[in-house]
């Protein structure tokens, strides 16, 4: 019946207010990457908490530091590495502080407790509410999806002054690997 609505194929260079141009698997991957970004770009402990891993204590609820600035978690490094690699490619992780922030310490994950990226200047909740992120599809094939995250910021960042919104565009790329879709280039409005 021609009166039934049908999904139209995603159009390159079209701007979207959501990620509807991605498949369900790709949207879930993006969500997982976004959730992981708070630890990958922010403080590593954020990711460990999100994934339910606990700090190893010395029995008195004190958190011992190992080496300089690292805390030990109750997960094997192999398990953690497998989980992070189910989201990101090595290429993507190499462009972050991953190798410095998360270390293999006698088979467990040691996390640098204070290393993090600064938030992008002008990142405010008010701007995000008034000007939510949008996306521009660049390429969508069976092997690769590229799109642009269009982020909005306030030049002044002050509540007292009127908004002076500016835009930064960030590339995002997903690639099909032998193990499924992975994020190969990733950015967020919060960390750039």
Spell out what each predicted region is.
Residues 2, 6-9, 61, 129, ...:
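Compositionally biased, intrinsically disordered/low-complexity regions enriched for serine, proline
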Residues 7, 11-14, 66, 134, ...:
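Intrinsically disordered, low-complexity segments enriched in proline/serine/threonine
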Residues 105-156:
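Surface-exposed, charged secondary-structure patches
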Residues 15-119:
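Core segments of small alpha/beta cavity-forming domains
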Residues 152-166:
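Short, cysteine-centered beta-strand-loop-beta hairpins and adjacent loop/turn segments enriched
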Residues 148, 165-192:
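Short beta-strand edge/turn micro-motifs at domain boundaries
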Residues 1-21, 189-192:
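Intrinsically disordered, low-complexity repeat and linker tracts
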Residues 17, 116, 139, 183-184:
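Intrinsic-disorder/low-complexity regions
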């Amino acid at each position: 019946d021609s009166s039934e609505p049908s999904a139209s194929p995603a159009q390159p260079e079209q701007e979207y207010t959501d990620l509807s141009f991605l498949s369900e698997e790709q949207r879930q991957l993006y969500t997982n990457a976004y959730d992981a970004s708070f630890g990958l770009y922010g403080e590593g402990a954020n990711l460990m908490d999100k994934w339910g891993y606990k700090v190893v204590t010395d029995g008195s609820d004190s958190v011992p530091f190992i080496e300089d600035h690292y805390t030990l978690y109750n997960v094997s490094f192999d398990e953690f590495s497998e989980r992070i690699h189910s989201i990101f490619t090595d290429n993507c992780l190499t462009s972050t502080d991953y190798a410095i922030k998360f270390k293999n310490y006698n088979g467990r994950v040691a996390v640098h407790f204070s290393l993090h990226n600064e938030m992008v200047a002008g990142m405010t909740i008010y701007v995000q509410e008034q000007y939510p992120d949008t996306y521009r599809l660049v390429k969508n094939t069976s092997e690769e999806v590229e799109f642009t995250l269009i982020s909005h910021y306030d030049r002044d960042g002050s509540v007292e002054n009127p908004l002076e919104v500016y835009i930064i565009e960030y590339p995002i790329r997903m690639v099909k690997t032998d193990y499924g879709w992975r994020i190969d280039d990733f950015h967020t409005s919060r960390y750039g």
